Amino acid sequence: MGIGVIDIDNHECMTLGSIQTSDCKTLDNMGKNLVDWYSNYLISRKDELQSIFRTVVADAFFSKETFITPMCESDFHVISRFRNDVVLYYPTLEKKTGKPGHPKWFDGRIDFANLDLTRCKEYEVNKGKLYGLRVYAKVLKRYVSLAVWYPMDGRTGKWQLYFSTDD
């Protein structure tokens, strides 16, 4: 596992350190899986890392509740990517009525082939369309900020879903 610091303005990355990932047998003996091991390692270095940054960027492998929740509880923010088949919901637009019971939590599942553009903010980007919105991610059991990118390179039905736990 490698930890690096990214300088976005200069398009550079500097390595802070690395550690050999434990093998499956060792992880099993510890009662952990790979996702648990990575989150525990980052959290164990929390004070050192948070003196430099609070945002962790991880690949789609880590877009799991068992990684995201411990990281957020340790005051880290996470940016990652969802798989294209992820289940996401629009937050409800209903207001409280004063009647007994809780209003519904969601207005429906998001269909990325037919995205409701009235709920999105569009951003100008090269070679595609980018939309931002707030969604509920079933896999993470939390609300996240979502960026949906539709590339304009001839690929139909191929969108990319990036999320952030930071509001």
Show where each model-derived region lies.
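Extended, non-catalytic structural segments that build the interaction scaffolds
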Residues: R155-D167
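Short, solvent-exposed loop/turn segments that connect beta-strands within catalytic domains
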Residues: D9-E12, D153-G157
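An internal, acidic/charged active-site-proximal segment
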Residues: Q20-W149, G154
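Active-site-proximal, Lys/Arg-enriched surface segment
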Residues: M1-T15, D75, K129-R134
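Active-site-proximal beta-strand elements of phosphoester/diester hydrolases
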Residues: L16, L146-A147, Y162-S164
